[in-house]
Design a protein with these regions (language model features):
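Short loop/turn segments that flank or connect secondary-structure elements
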Residues: 1-142
Length: 142
């Protein structure tokens, strides 16, 4: 696992300028995600539909993890894409892993680690397919 670059007051700017973060335009600072439960039935799916009728909202699915993505730029992201409160940033920002960051995915042309759904119809088809696959799996075990 690669060592995550940590900037502090004693930070060497030369190292930071060579880091992946220095090449990025703050992609991870332009949205937040909130974990949600995977929908188990049509009522759950309709509740997720409510999220998707709002602008700037999408659903991310990464393996068994489900999240609501809210497009919302951090108020501390500066014009040069650096953090204005870097030394006092929240713990979530300190723990952010650059190994699977959005910039690396785009710059290295890697597949995303998650599926993103902005449109309910596409999400509904995906979920119904998962339910059908799970149902077939249960029938085979009998």
């Amino acid at each position: 696992m690669k060592k995550q670059l940590k900037r502090t007051k004693k930070h060497d700017k030369k190292d930071w300028k060579q880091s992946i973060c220095a090449k990025c335009k703050g992609l991870c600072c332009k949205y937040i995600t909130v974990d949600i439960e995977e929908p188990k039935d049509d009522e759950d799916l309709d509740n997720i539909r409510w999220y998707l009728i709002h602008d700037g909202i999408s659903i991310l699915v990464e393996d068994e993890r489900w999240m609501v993505k809210v497009d919302a730029r951090c108020k501390h992201l500066q014009a040069d894409y650096q953090c204005a409160v870097y030394n006092r940033r929240p713990e979530a920002c300190k723990q952010y892993d650059t190994e699977n960051c959005d910039y690396r995915t785009v710059s290295e042309n890697l597949p995303k680690a998650y599926r993103e759904f902005e449109e309910y119809g596409r999400l509904r088809r995906y979920v119904k397919g998962r339910w059908a696959k799970a149902h077939r799996g249960r029938k085979k075990k009998r």
